[in-house]
Amino acid sequence: MQPKDYMSSSHANWENIQIDSFTSWINQHLSERGLSVKDLSVDFQDGVLLLNLLEILSGKKIARYVRSPKFLQHKIDNIMIAFNFMEKAFDIKVFGCNAKDIVDGNLKQTMGVIFLLIQKIKVNLHLDHLQEQQGETTGTTTTITSTNTTTTPTKPRFYRASMQVNAANRFSHISPNKDQSSSTVATTTTTSTSVVQPQPQPTTATPTTTTATTLTPPVASQQPVSTAPATVTPSTVIPTVTPLNTTTTTTTATSTSTNVPTATTNVPPTATTTTTGTRISPTTGVSVSTIRSKFLFEGGTGNTTGGNEKYNTYSPGSGNTSGVVGPSTSSSLNISSERVLKRTESGYLISGGLSLSGSGSGGIHEPLQRTVSLIEIKLNDHQSKFYDLKKIIFMQSVIRGYLVRSKWRNVLEKYKQHLNEYKKHFMNNKKAYRGLIRVQAIVKGKIQRKKLFKMFPLYRRNEIVKEILSTEDKYVTSLAMVTTHYLKPSEAFLSTQQVRSIFSQIEIIHRYNSLILEKLVSRNKIWYSSGQKIGDIFIEMSAFLKVYTIYVNNYNNSIQTITECMEIPKFASLLEKNRNQFGLDLSAFLIAPIQRIPRYILLLQDLLKNTKESHPDHQDLSLALKKMKDVAEYVNEKKREAENLNQVLTIQSSLTGKFNNLAEPHRRYVKKGTLISNDKIHLYFLFNDLLVKTENKIVSKIRDSARLSNNNSSDKNSKSTFHSPKEIINEGKSKYLNSYFLAGSSLVDSNPDGFTFQIIGVGDANELNSQINNQINNQNNNQNNNQNNNLNNNNDDSPILSFSPFSSSFASTITNSLSSIGNSNNVNNNNNTSSNSGFVNSSNNNINIVNSNGSSPLTNSGHGLNSSFGISSNNNNNLTMPTTSIQLEALSLNEKMTWMGELDECIFQLLEKSKSKKRSLITDADELTTVPFDISVVKDSEFSNVLEKKHSEISWRSKKFYLKNTHLYYHRYSSTESPKEPTKIKCINLILCSVKLAQVVDHPHCFQLITPSRIYFFSCEDSTVLFQWISLIRLSIKKKLESLKDENNNINNFTSIASATSPTSSSSNTTPIVVPIASHSNATGSLSASLGSSFLNQQQRSLEQQQHLNTSNSNLTPLALSSQVLYHINNFISTSTSTSASQSQSQSPSPSPSHSINQKQKIRKLSFYQSRSNTLININNDEDRLNSFPTSTLSVSCLLNNDNHGNNDFDGKSFTNNIDITTTTTTNDDNNNNTTTTQVKKGKDLSCSKELNCSISHDDNSKGSSGYGNNSCGDNINNDESNNNCAECGASDPSWVSINYGVVVCLDCSSIHKNLPEGNVKSVRSLSVAFSDIVKKQEGNIKANNKYEKNIPSGLTKPNPKDSYEIKLSWIKAKYINNNNNNNNSQNGDSTTPTPTPTSTTIHVNNDSTPTSPNLNSQSSPPPTATTTQTENVKLDNGRSSPTPTPTQTENNNNNVLTPTTTTTNTTTSTTTGSRPTTPTILNNEEEHIQGINLKDSTDTSNGKGTWSRGSSHAITERKTSFLDKPRVPVKKEHQGYLFKTSSPTSNNSSDWKKYLFVYKNDVLTYYKVSKKNKRKEKGIIDLFHSVKQESRPKQKYSFTLVTSQRLYFLASETEEEMKIWLDVLSSHTTH
């Protein structure tokens, strides 16, 4: 160690001085064994270095200790062994020091043990010094006598003899006291400022003595050791320094006699030297060297400076000492020389040595060292001899080697002797020789097997690959054999259906597996050069293996069909012939595809097991195995679904009586069994949404036998002796009695110990059927009466309603029936009563019949209907879903719990299905926020009870729960004896929760509450409370979901247009036409928007007007395509003809003079231009295309009546019906023009008639775009010749269409399109009229390819059908994704795109003998003065800027153009506020400019009542979008940092927030747990998050919530800046 200067201007750090001093002292001793200490607290933990130090100090060997401790107990044992050794060898008893503390690295304890060793050695040195002083002669002589010096033998002590040399100097600076001013006991230092050079004194020695060694006792800080010959030579004075700032010198006098060097360490007391007075480091002093360099020898005689340098080397430092070397006087000491000898294995060595260091001015000097090459051997008590140390060491090594070899030589000789004996034995005994050879073979074989075992996985892997290849070859061969020798020959004598039933998809399977075999064979040829990979082939082909689904589902039918076809002789002979040829039956070949996929899984599992993780194929094999398992699960799931459907069909075939269709696509069979109802046992079939009640004769007989057993037995539970349900229901057929719909129902267990339970709120199908049939019969009777009285020429029979509430055809059936009987709802039988019209919603095979005011009598999801039921009639009788409660009794308690569990699961699934439909209506705020607790919850809660909540895996805690407003509050439960106010009340938002039964071992009555963030388990006291909680929670969730109304739920509703006849003209009745029209959201349910509303009588209009005044106008609902356009037409006709006329008639008793019979015919013409994206509406002039409405269908409703006198009386007083509707459909296809006209007339021939002509013509450039005709959208796509091949690879007969890109692709490419951003594909066969928007984008593959393939890189070539998946993927990505933006820009900037030919729809309103149309301004319109033809131009604007209308010259009595509002003139429109009719503004010589309805800007003038009012703006209300609808976008930012995460955000315990490292990259947020060594361990991945909300938490101020589709993540940052960064990064993801 380099010495350190610890002194500074202030006091030194005493602790560091002690540590360094102790370390230096320990290292000086441990260096003998090549050991060292760097840190006392660490290096002494295992006790090994401490034991080595004790061995060096004591010179003894410690027998047993653990030299390489690895366990804690081993280290403690080493420390305890060291303590015991210190007590025995050094007599040091350690108190207050624990071995465990030293093992734990306690520095103070370790330094205490070292200090005890140092102090013990210092004390022993002092005692030795005192004993040696007592053995000296009384007189001190300065000469050395010639006689041998006799010494008094002393008892050897347990410390090193080397410690005698300057021991005081060595330990003086390691004092436990900080005050170093006092010197050690018996320490004498000579301090002087002058140089003393004593004169040498001659001594004589006897011839018999060679040398005499004299040891002086330790005096002061020096332990002089002197060996003097007969003659005295000048001594060498070497300065040394004590720990104090005083100057001390040590003079070494060396005398030689016969050129034999002697080691002298004796310093006379008078010999002193002086130093320059510079400060010297306290660590500078005399230290102990190794065993083999104990003493510094001087050779030769005379002065030291001229002595033998071989034995005397001097290496001073940079400074110079002021000591002067001169002769010294050595004193004769009578001390025995045994103290300086240390016994070793080879003899006595002189122990001790000097290593001096001095200092110069301003620096630290290197130590003064002298080498030792001689050693003195004590021959006897009086003689000793010096030997060369190197020679001694060499001799020792030779001797030791000889001893070791001699030891082992005997062993080897004995071993060779035994071998010779064994050899003779085996050579003479052949049996033993054979046994020896056998043993050797076993041992060698075991060794070789171990080597082979290491190479076995690779060998086994190659064998598995060969097995895959061979089995695939055999499998494809068998499929080809079935196709060639069974399928094709059987087509000659079997029907197509029979062939399809037997062989199913075996040809397609053969084609795909042939492709797999081809890839496997090609890979096997380049097996070693390809990296021995096979997993990628199965990954690529796994998606195509789903074709096995149809085959697996059809297998049972295939076997049954084979049995049936065996009656055909040709087929039987074919099977017999092939059986004899191939040795296998047809069924053996057909079972092969069923077994192939499981075989794939087994082979891949074995292959993955024998593949190392470092192998390049390991990852692909893992993925291939996963995909293969997914395929197997998919096939099995489809198999279960098919079997379930077959089970439903079987059950339906086993039922007798009148019942409806049970085999619905959504219906699944669950359970069947016997239950007791009304003291009768019945057979019940449970489906996922339906409970069917039947009667079985076998069951009845068993019931009778059960009664007898009950009478003979006193046991109340004797019913449990019934036969199992399977034994009962497998025989005979059952009679259908009733069925119950489970949607919205609840279970009640009023008797937990009994066998009975109740189902409340179930829908009764029989009651519903009877109500609907009664209602329909009444309507049919009324319709028949009306038709007999007023429609004598109409011989059409009234339709009879025949429906099935179970089938999807129920909606269409009841819709058509209601359309046919619409008249009967609105007939006025001379009672001056007006009717209401019903609105029917028919979409997605569902029906919604509501009242005219928009209310729904009942909501029920039963029998395949997911909407409300209700029909409004004159008597206000609503058709509602009848509900009832049924009480059932099981045959045993176990069977009861089984039934209740299955029923609860079905109800739970139905509620989840309805919740999923409302999911998009739930906002983030409703989902994340909870209602704060109010004390009123405790008093006014819907339900409250004490439940046990699961706190951990083994502990449950009682809590008091309150249910209110879709929130569940709970707090700690306090007993009734000591009631307390509730504290720490928590809340659970139930809006997205699910509740269902749960099975817990030690808690029998449990249910689980599933929230987005966690799952709660609750335990009830009995089953009654259990099902009560489940029912109430579900009811609360259901009410909340029903309160979420979608503003688009009334789109495409059907209304039955009602009209009332005049009280004075009872014989004049009208026949309304049912048309699709949008319903209104206002509370009055006004029908004035429809065309028929203009003919309501005065009382009805007054009633509606009064209701309108009491209610506020609401915005119109966004309409569907067809409904929106029709709404504009009807509203326009109603406004321009009927409403104002009715108003005028009601305010003026006499008809207007403008209603002249002699006026010429007036024609109103409305034209609709429909293109691929919009529809243009024009009035009078086809070229004025002023408004566009997106629509694809058109339906027109009109009802016009004239009185007998030829006057138009639009207020409904007198009408005569004559309707002429002509519908013309024109198809323009290049040069072909096809027109279809349909004309319908009803009523009598009158002198005055009104004609409504509707002609519809549309462009047929894009086939199927309009949606008309019998052909579906899929047929129209197939008719395009460019779609005969795949747009990507050119494969023939593509069957999939890409919705986003409008191309028709094959099955292989459809899987790639499906994975594109926003990719969506549909099967061409599944397309119908509902997918007309898809067809509009489909322009044909040739046009689409020309558009998308413009910017594809030149390096890519178009793939062919045989190319790999990767080639097709790269082509499709380059075609659509990389150039998507360029294509969009080019489309937006292309102004030369030709406008498609529009579809024109024209409505002609012809008034044959009508003078003019009614005047809209009844208050201020002047009477007409002339009767001339007038052409009125009316424009419907959509809020966009339009050119100023061109004035048209008109000739009329008043020359006025009727217009309610205008935006192109400076004239303001006058409006009447508060009244339904509005007075329009009369503009002279200007065309009528009417703005559109339901427009997107503030100029909308519709008030939803069929009138026009300026300022009544109705902005379009768009559908609420859920955060689930947000698409995934490419990542824009990357970020990482530490965040806190918790699952209990409301907790006040800060330890619940755990710190993780979050890394956001590629739209994925991954969080890791980082160890102290900075190693990451992945804890989870957060993907598909859609919104971020910042809100503070109790223990985290800067916290925010991350919303995903599965759960909520509560995160927090340390600073506000970090939180803002995270919010910006995550928000950039959610906004896209």
From Swiss-Prot:
Alphabetical list of PANTHER family matching this protein: DH DOMAIN-CONTAINING PROTEIN-RELATED, FACIOGENITAL DYSPLASIA PROTEIN
What does the UniProt keyword field contain? Answer: Cytoplasmic vesicle, GTPase activation, Membrane, Metal-binding, Repeat, Zinc, Zinc-finger
Q: Give a yes or no for keyword Metal-binding in this entry.
A: yes
This chain belongs to the protein called Guanine exchange factor for Rac 30
- List where this protein forms a coiled coil: none
Keyword check for Lipoprotein, yes or no: no
Task: Tell me the GO molecular function terms.
Answer: GTPase activator activity; guanyl-nucleotide exchange factor activity; phosphatidylinositol-3,4,5-trisphosphate binding; small GTPase binding; zinc ion binding
Every Arf-GAP domain range: 1271-1389
Q: Which GO terms describe its biological process?
A: aggregation involved in sorocarp development; intracellular signal transduction; sorocarp development
Indicate the segments forming the PH domain, all copies. 940-1038, 1532-1631
Role summary: GTPase-activating protein for Rac involved in streaming and development.
Polar residues bias locations: 1500-1515
**Which SUPFAM superfamilies does the annotation name?**
ArfGap/RecO-like zinc finger (SSF57863), Calponin-homology domain, CH-domain (SSF47576), DBL homology domain (DH-domain) (SSF48065), PH domain-like (SSF50729)
- Protein location: Membrane; Cytoplasmic vesicle, Phagosome membrane
| Record-level GO cellular component terms | cell cortex; cytoplasm; cytoskeleton; early phagosome; membrane; phagocytic vesicle membrane
The consequence of inactivating this gene is:
Cells display defective streaming during development under different conditions and a delay in developmental timing.
Q: List compositional bias (Low complexity) regions by residue number.
A: 137-154, 180-284, 775-795, 1138-1156, 1380-1402, 1409-1431, 1441-1481
- Zn finger residue spans: C4-type: 1286-1309
Which membrane topology describes this protein? Peripheral membrane protein
Where does the DH domain start and stop, copy by copy?
Answer: 460-638
Q: Which residues form the Calponin-homology (CH) domain?
A: 16-122
Q: What is the top-level taxon of the source organism?
A: Eukaryota
| Region annotation Disordered: where it falls in the sequence | 134-155, 171-285, 775-798, 1138-1161, 1380-1521
Upper classification of the organism? Eukaryota, Amoebozoa, Evosea, Eumycetozoa, Dictyostelia
Q: What is known of its domains?
A: The membrane association is mediated by the calponin-homology (CH) domain.
Q: Which gene encodes it?
A: gxcDD
| Stretches assigned to the IQ domain | 388-417, 432-461
